[in-house]
Amino acid sequence: MGLKLSRGPVKEKSPLEFTRVHILTYFTTNSYLRNLVSKKRRRLIIGGYDLDMSYISDKLLAMSFPAERMRAVYRNPLWQVKSVLDMRHPDHYKVYNLCIEESYDPDNFYGRVERFPFDDNHVPSLKMIQLFCESVHSWLSLDPKNIAVVHCMAGKGRTGLMVSAYLVYGGMSAEEALEMYASRRTTNNNGVSIPSQRRYVKYWSDLLSFSKKGPPEVKLPQEHSRELLRIRLYDTANVDSVFFVVSELQEVPNEMYRPSVELARGCCRQFKKGYCRSSSPRYYISHVNCDSEEDEEVTDGEEPHLVVQMDTESSIIDEKTCLDFYFDKPVRVSGDIRITFYQKMIGSRLFYTCFNTAFITNGLLQFSIGELDKVGGNGRSISGPDFSLELLFGPACSKFGKFLSRDDLSLS
């Protein structure tokens, strides 16, 4: 004869816990907060759900993060996303997560999840863009019913960069892809708004060559290092010094994510009138066609193609306030570079920019205020009407380049 185990008394929820559960249930089923957070992003209303997701094409779906617990109050609830995808594309969807800051169990989507993580409001490596496009192409080629679901956190910037890159991989121009994403993802045609992210879509476009059939050939640039000599902020206002940090995305073995590693830091200051830094190279001759090993070999009878690169100094510059920093020892940079500017060394970021050294065509990179990233009120307050960030680099190929002093050139 067995023993009967009586059920213990059921523990009632405390009033506080009961209220908490009801509040959470209300907000996760009510889309008011999620509509508020999604701003101008297009939403999909289906099956009683109101979700922050948009079809960019019949094969590409962009959305914000599929969240659980409290985050589901203002992001797409994961269970609702899963329900909609299972209803519309059963067994034919794969999710691409671009977030480095958040993840979830891939089993929520039957294991069909792949991660390509990079920092929010920033850019991935060109290699990551290639791997992403090849993965999406491979998945979509398996079955005509397959679709790719791409998200970051808000489902706008990083998502827009990668979706636009895949549209370029499919044959569009960079501008066409960015415009298509903007019109399909937002109600105000403001899709990929961060200049560096748009810049990388254009970089990607330059690396593709198309044949009549099949995917394009990708020609990733070889490692291309340059020496950063000087940073100048041209036409500044209301400020006498600006701090900066130069960093580089560095590869980690067996990891997809490339962290940003600091290479140098300093402070751009206003030099007094008449200040002369004779040790700083102002002019040099550079061999411009030395991007590959074949170009570096110049025969005795062949004159190398030389170009004079100048850090221009003229009377008009003297009329503007410029903040300068010269590196005593040039900083060698290679690949994907990020330079961030601060009002103070700790906090108070003004703006930043990202670029790849393989796309530096001469010794001077210039960025207007509209070409810099996340420029807020503080950044605009120090910028004059002709503001420009100027980065001066050494010769592309030291084999044929030599520094010249100001007196070595006669200038008209």
Curated annotation (Swiss-Prot):
GO terms for biological process: phosphatidylinositol dephosphorylation; pollen development. PROSITE patterns: C2_TENSIN, PPASE_TENSIN, TYR_PHOSPHATASE_1, TYR_PHOSPHATASE_2. Inhibited by vanadate. Disruption phenotype: Pollen cell death after mitosis, during the late stage of development, characterized by collapsed pollen grains, shrunken, with highly deformed exines and reduced size. Keywords: Hydrolase, Lipid metabolism, Phospholipid metabolism, Protein phosphatase. InterPro entries: C2_domain_sf, Dual-spec_lipid-protein_phosph, Prot-tyrosine_phosphatase-like, PTP_PTEN, Tensin_C2-dom, Tensin_phosphatase, Tyr_Pase_AS, Tyr_Pase_dom. Its EC number is 3.1.3.48, 3.1.3.67. It comes from the Eukaryota. Residues 42-211 form the Phosphatase tensin-type domain. Expressed exclusively in pollen grains during the late stage of development (at protein level). GO terms for molecular function: phosphatase activity; phosphatidylinositol phosphate phosphatase activity; phosphatidylinositol-3,4,5-trisphosphate 3-phosphatase activity; protein tyrosine phosphatase activity. The active site is at 152 (phosphocysteine intermediate). Residues 239-396 form the C2 tensin-type domain. Changing residue 152 to S: Loss of phosphatase activity. The keyword Hydrolase applies. It catalyses: O-phospho-L-tyrosyl-[protein] + H2O = L-tyrosyl-[protein] + phosphate; a 1,2-diacyl-sn-glycero-3-phospho-(1D-myo-inositol-3,4,5-trisphosphate) + H2O = a 1,2-diacyl-sn-glycero-3-phospho-(1D-myo-inositol-4,5-bisphosphate) + phosphate. It is an enzyme of class 3 (hydrolase). Protein tyrosine phosphatase that also exhibits lipid phosphatase activity. Can use phosphatidylinositol substrates such as PtdIns(3,4,5)P(3) as substrate. Pollen-specific phosphatase required for pollen development. Belongs to the PTEN phosphatase protein family. This is Phosphatidylinositol 3,4,5-trisphosphate 3-phosphatase and protein-tyrosine-phosphatase PTEN1. It comes from Arabidopsis thaliana.
